[in-house]
Amino acid sequence: MLKVLVTICIAFIYLPNTSSAQFFEQGQFIKDIENRVLWLRCSVGQVWSPETKTCAGKIVKLNQEEIKVAIIQAGEQLPGAWRLPTLSELESLVCSSCTPAKVKNKYFPGIAREAYWSGTRNSFNRNMFWSVNFQTGHKYSRFMAYQQLPFLLVQDY
């Protein structure tokens, strides 16, 4: 009995980290089981190429008001209710061991090495929103709503 228990304990030590199974590819979408969201795997402005397995096109940078219009347009072109990711959801994409861009390129190719909008406002200054910089992997709340940054879209599932 003790031998079986020791074997089970050792097996759990060597199980792969569950965070490595966070993402599942679904064509132009990434299913994120940790956050229970579906990501558009390319930055807004880019399109997914299944042949090259990469994002093509120019990344669009918008301010928070312009993003509201882009979200409406995304809803007209793709099924579901799209939105900006929360700070927590966006931070979950950071791969600290990756070289810049600090994101798992397999799932999110073409991410710019710069700050991306989240939909989370700064609670101390409601004119500012949190962002995640994929050059460094750090979060910041130093951008005003009128500034233009790239962004990703998600929907709940």
Q: Where would I find each of the regions flagged by the language model?
A:
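Sec-dependent N-terminal signal peptides
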Residues: V4-I13
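Sec/Tat signal peptide C-region and signal peptidase I cleavage site
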Residues: L15-A21
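Short aromatic-cysteine micro-motif
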Residues: Q28, I33-N35, L40-R83, L87-L90, ...
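An exposed tryptophan-centered "aromatic clamp" motif
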Residues: K68-A81, L87-Q135, D156
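Short, small/polar residue-rich loop motifs at catalytic or cofactor-binding pockets
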Residues: F24-Q26
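Short, structured beta-strand segments at or near domain termini in extracellular proteins/domains
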Residues: W117, R142-Y157
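General secretory precursor processing signal
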Residues: F12, G45, K58, C98-A101
